[in-house]
């Protein structure tokens, strides 16, 4: 008597406590939850819409002078306006921050102080006309 169909290697695989389960055999790889699939479909729809918008700007008979690439705008925003998640304070950045924050203030204080001292020292006190001092 022949037994039922033989099991495949994936069905016979049992996880080992020393080795993690390969991604190919992990059911979570294939059985994604509905909300995760919806979020992924939404991201793909946004990406397709942005790509279509860019290609329409690029391939019009009278293209605008500046063609805005949404991916480039997002990259530029992430690079310039969103620096705090990737910023690491080091002695160099702390020193440069202090120099650029306090340096101009000290410069203008010194400039006005020396100007006031030099202009006050050159002018001698003169009394009113006809008044002897």
UniProtKB/Swiss-Prot annotation:
GO terms for cellular component: mitochondrial inner membrane; respiratory chain complex I. The chain crosses the membrane at residues 92-112. It holds the Pfam family NDUF_B4. Keywords: Electron transport, Membrane, Mitochondrion, Mitochondrion inner membrane, Respiratory chain, Transmembrane, Transmembrane helix, Transport. It is a single-pass membrane protein. It is found in: Mitochondrion inner membrane. The keyword Electron transport applies. Accessory subunit of the mitochondrial membrane respiratory chain NADH dehydrogenase (Complex I), that is believed not to be involved in catalysis. Complex I functions in the transfer of electrons from NADH to the respiratory chain. The immediate electron acceptor for the enzyme is believed to be ubiquinone. Complex I is composed of 45 different subunits. Belongs to the complex I NDUFB4 subunit family. This is NADH dehydrogenase [ubiquinone] 1 beta subcomplex subunit 4. It comes from Gallus gallus.
